[in-house]
Structures are given as structure tokens and as C-alpha cells.
Amino acid sequence: MSPDFVITKGDLLPILPFQCQYRDGTFADLTGVTSVKFVMQLKGVTAEKINTSVGVTILNPVLQVGSILPHGTYSWSGTDTDTPGDYQAWIVVTFASGKILHFPNYGRSRVQVTLAE
């Protein structure tokens, strides 16, 4: 399968857009959430490369079905992209009720960090 997002080793741009979408095509309402984290893990490794809310920005808390706008973005920093490889990535949302939900909730997004050509 091809990656959902490709970035070159050491690059911190472009920022990573994300949507929190349910399997049925509807979007989560992120109004009033208490935390949104970006998590990224190298395939085959149990340790997480990234697990942070720092750098996560909510731009559009409410999206309509069919929207191509992102709910938000993750801004890469530091050593986020220093190790080439195929990664799994997901968003962890904590709602005001304290309940937690992972997106995508039907698999993981694929991020590839490549070597510069």
C-alpha cells in the first residue's frame, strides 16, 4: 500500500494535515475537546517515535461530510523525521467527558520518511 503522507528525512515541512473521520464518512466534532495528540510509530517497533499534543493545531473543529478541509495539523519538530522508514500514525482525541477515541478508528495512517535523493 502506498503511504498517506511522505516526507524526506530531516525535513520539518510540509505540515501534516489530519481529519478525524468515522468509518461511515462522518466527522468527529472536536468542539471542546481537552486534548488532541499525534502519535507515530515505526512499523515493527513497539516504542512510539512521537506521542505529543505539542505542535497539534485545531483549525476546523466541525466538518461536514465530503469536506476536504483538515480538522487540524501537526507541525513536525526536532528529530521527528530523523529516521527513514515506514510508520503508522494516528490521532488520539480526549473529549470533555474524559472519553478517548483514536483516529482513524479502523486502521492506521501510513507515513513514510524517505532518504533525500
Briefly describe each language-model feature range.
Residues M1-E117:
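Contiguous segments within soluble domain cores/interaction surfaces
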